[in-house]
Design a protein with these regions (language model features):
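N-terminal intrinsically disordered, cationic/polar leader segments
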Residues: 1-91, 98, 105-131
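Aromatic (phenylalanine/tyrosine) cluster motif
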Residues: 130-131, 135-140
């Protein structure tokens, strides 16, 4: 199953400007990634939502980010399973990652990298054609 096309539907973020703190290379930045996948009725199109919460050493919010896509597959998905979802995500994650890394660089978080989305899977919930994947990503040390 291949991704035929994708459209960026929404890019929303909130930066904690009240913090007024500059981050140094030896600080740990923690990221929490949530992924929501919902297949539409035709089972060929899907909504894909990524949510990232970024926290500093003191568990103070640095950034909240929500990115929504609509993906169109080349064929109708016949068997929507956890392994199928992970396969689609593994193909799409590099596209998402490139967008986010460019965004991070534009707001001054030049050395923060996104870990691979399967780093430490916390849980998967399935509701018919709707999956919610939560991942607690490894803390990333700025360097």
């Amino acid at each position: 199953m291949e991704i035929k096309k994708y459209i960026l539907k929404k890019f929303d973020y909130d930066v904690n400007v009240s913090n007024k703190k500059f981050y140094t290379p030896n600080e740990t930045i923690k990221q929490k990634l949530g992924i929501n996948v919902k297949f539409l009725e035709d089972r060929k199109n899907m909504n894909l939502t990524f949510k990232i919460d970024m926290l500093d050493n003191d568990n103070i919010d640095i950034l909240k980010l929500k990115v929504e896509y609509i993906l169109t597959l080349n064929n109708e998905a016949l068997d929507i399973s956890e392994s199928f979802i992970k396969k689609i995500l593994s193909k799409f994650y590099p596209i998402f990652s490139k967008l986010i890394l460019n965004f991070y660089n534009s707001i001054g978080l030049n050395n923060v990298q996104l870990p691979e989305f399967w780093a430490k899977e916390k849980g998967i919930q399935k509701m018919d054609t709707f999956f919610t994947l939560l991942y607690y990503l490894f803390p990333y040390i700025l360097s």
